[in-house]
């Protein structure tokens, strides 16, 4: 029993809370709702009678009291000519990924409606500036943007609509719009490309028998100096045209278009893409000047170059649309990637030459043969220097070794003056105490008469590098820069 009472109480409180919330919402809606304007044709005779007879409001009421906005001017007669012009407030940059651009414009339309001719007793100016709320009471062209993706009106602080009614029945409407328009891009020459973006104004429901759009004579599109981050747009490059379309089953529909020519500025891509990738390619060539057996230095340099170029390609691919054709930037990046990869392949070929046993043995044989030839030349020199008894012939040509020897000549008189006639020509570091009387090096004995032990380790053997490996590096130093320079000449002559 207690449980059922608790449930009933909970349900009752929930209903009361829901009712209170609904009342609060309805009161907020009532406060936020604007007062609805009634057209003169919708007002009662009593309301119209309250307006002073000689006032401007009364003149407007007289014009619109029998006006039907559902019927176009000159019904069943000549088509209505609507003169169109546009003032561009701002022009957004083109988005390559979505292939569109955004503009903020004042759209102005002017047509003649004989039903709105001001009466002859109107003593004011030649035009009436009418409140925008009256715009819905008039007939208006059903203009829409054929290549529009999204659009919106502006209503801060009031609806951005300007309405004029002229004495002869001309109606001028100006409204502020922000529109995102599609612009199919041809990126074959990207980033040295020039794009042509259209804005098409078309009638939605009226055929050419009822309505025609006409560009205003003179400058139908007014464009202030606009600075875009990536493009240059000039007033002289704007083109106008007619794009009247035929739809099967309904007929021809009037359409006018304006074409904007936008030339891309290459500076950003020169500094952000071309210069860094060029430097990476040049960096990969440094490996040709590094010793062929220094794989610890050459391999990381080549891998770094290839990975950096691949990363640049991936980053740019994410910022551009997925198109099926090759862009100019793709050609550059692929070429740079191939040059970086080729430098890595070049070192692989050098390593093959370096580790080829036949080439290594052939190089060792060549070196041994050269040393043998040098040895024979040394012996001949020695024979010319020392005679058969060991007597020096020309002491300045004695081979002074590193072995330090003990003095054995007891006095200078032991020297044969006829043999050492040019002692004065000895080098400064030549110590006579280390040589015997005939200029031959002798061993130095310790106190026990044993030769002094030499603990010096023999130097490590030099790696044998085949001549073919060195020749490949030598050719690469000239071939790679020449090929890259040739590619640059062809590339820039085509795309610039």
UniProtKB/Swiss-Prot annotation:
Q: Does the keyword ATP-binding apply?
A: no
Q: Does the keyword Transport apply?
A: yes
Question: Which tissues is this protein detected in according to the database?
Answer: Detected in spinal cord and brain stem (at protein level). Detected in spinal cord, cerebellum and brain cortex.
| Topology term for the membrane | Multi-pass membrane protein
Per its record, the protein catalyses: chloride(in) = chloride(out)
Sites binding glycine 2 sit at 250
Which InterPro entries does the UniProt entry name for this protein? Answer: Glycine_rcpt_B, GlyR_beta__ECD, GlyR_beta_TM, Neur_chan_lig-bd, Neur_chan_lig-bd_sf, Neur_channel, Neuro-gated_channel_TM_sf, Neuro_actylchol_rec
Q: What is its main location?
A: membrane
Question: For site (Important for obstruction of the ion pore in the closed conformation), what residue positions does UniProt give?
Answer: 307
Per UniProt, subcellular location reads as: Postsynaptic cell membrane; Cell membrane; Synapse; Perikaryon
| Classification via NCBIfam families | LIC
State the protein's name: Glycine receptor subunit beta
Q: Which organism is it from?
A: Rattus norvegicus
């Amino acid at each position: 029993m207690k449980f059922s009472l608790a449930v009933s109480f909970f349900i009752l409180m929930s209903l009361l809370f829901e009712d209170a919330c609904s009342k609060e919402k309805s009161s907020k809606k009532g406060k936020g709702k604007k007062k609805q304007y009634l057209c003169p044709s919708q007002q009662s005779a009593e309301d119209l009678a309250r307006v002073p007879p000689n006032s401007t409001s009364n003149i407007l009421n007289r014009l619109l009291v029998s006006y039907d906005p559902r019927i176009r001017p000159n019904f069943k007669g000549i088509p209505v000519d609507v003169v169109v012009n546009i003032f561009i407030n701002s022009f957004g940059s083109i988005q390559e990924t979505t292939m569109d651009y955004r503009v903020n414009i004042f759209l102005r339309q002017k047509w003649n409606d004989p039903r709105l001719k001001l009466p002859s007793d109107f003593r004011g100016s030649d035009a009436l500036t009418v409140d925008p709320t009256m715009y819905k009471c008039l007939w208006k062209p059903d203009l829409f943007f054929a290549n529009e993706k999204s659009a919106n009106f502006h209503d801060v602080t009031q609806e951005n609509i300007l309405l004029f009614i002229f004495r002869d029945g001309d109606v001028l409407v100006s409204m502020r719009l922000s529109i995102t328009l599609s612009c199919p891009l041809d990126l074959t020459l990207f980033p040295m490309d020039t794009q042509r973006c259209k804005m098409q104004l078309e009638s939605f429901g009226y055929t050419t028998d009822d309505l025609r759009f006409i560009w205003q004579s003179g400058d139908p599109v007014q464009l202030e100096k606009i600075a875009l981050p990536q493009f240059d747009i000039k007033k002289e490059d704007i083109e106008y045209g007619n794009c009247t379309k035929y739809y099967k089953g309904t007929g021809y529909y009037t359409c006018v278009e304006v074409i904007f020519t936008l030339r891309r500025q290459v500076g950003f891509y020169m500094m952000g893409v071309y210069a860094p990738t060029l430097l990476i390619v040049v960096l990969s060539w440094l490996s040709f000047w590094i010793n062929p057996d220094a794989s610890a230095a050459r391999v990381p340099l080549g891998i770094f170059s290839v990975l950096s170029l691949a990363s640049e390609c991936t980053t740019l691919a994410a910022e551009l649309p997925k198109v099926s054709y090759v862009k100019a930037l793709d050609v550059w990046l692929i070429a740079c990637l191939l040059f970086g990869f080729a430098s890595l392949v070049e070192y692989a070929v050098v390593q093959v030459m370096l580790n080829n046993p036949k080439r290594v043995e052939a190089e060792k044989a060549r070196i041994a043969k050269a040393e043998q030839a040098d040895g024979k030349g040394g012996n001949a020199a020695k024979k010319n220097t020392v005679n058969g008894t060991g007597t020096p012939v020309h002491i300045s040509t004695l081979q002074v070794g590193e072995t330090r020897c003990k003095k054995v000549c007891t006095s200078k008189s032991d020297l044969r003056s006829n043999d050492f006639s040019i002692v004065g020509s000895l080098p400064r570091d030549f110590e006579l105490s280390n040589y015997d009387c005939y200029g031959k090096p002798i061993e130095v004995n310790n106190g026990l008469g044993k030769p002094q032990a030499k603990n010096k380790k023999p130097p490590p053997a030099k790696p044998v590098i085949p001549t073919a490996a060195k020749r490949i590096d030598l050719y690469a130093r000239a071939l790679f820069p020449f090929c890259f320079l040739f590619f640059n000449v062809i590339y820039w002559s085509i795309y610039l």
